Amino acid sequence: MKRILVDSCVWLACFDKTDSNHCCADKILKVLNLHDIIVPYPTLYETINTRFAKYIYGQMNGLFGFINNPSKVHLVDDTAYRERARSIIFSNINKGKPYSLVDMIIRLMMEDVSLGPFAVLTFNVGDFVGVNSTEIINPREI
């Protein structure tokens, strides 16, 4: 059984029927049901603060039903990564490295050996390639 960190875009694809990647939802959910899930709080902030929360109230129940399973889903506090992520984002703002704050926090988590090994499930593979030896899984390829 793997541990898989799920990026915001994957939650949107699974539970927002209007998302361009929703066609992958069934495959994604089958995979997630087989593994332990790591959910960094920033991905919840990003997911819930999008069109998802504003327009798709009923589908949020699917997300919360999935996430509220403490035997499979592990919420990770981002406090330890916030300041460094902010600092990196602002120092790289004019260097052509445009990562979002959420993506930077995920990248820092990927570097944190204390979290143990995990894979990252994301449609935005390019945002995470090259961080340690973390496996990056593109949902279109599962």
How should each PLM-predicted stretch be described?
Residues 1-39, 51-65, 142:
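Short, well-structured N-terminal submotif of metal-dependent ribonuclease cores
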Residues 8, 43, 122:
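Ser/Thr-centric signal marking residues that sit
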Residues 73-123:
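Active-site neighborhoods of divalent-metal-dependent phosphate/nucleic-acid chemistry enzymes
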Residues 41, 77-79, 124, 140-141:
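Residues at the C-termini of beta-strands that transition into short coil/loop
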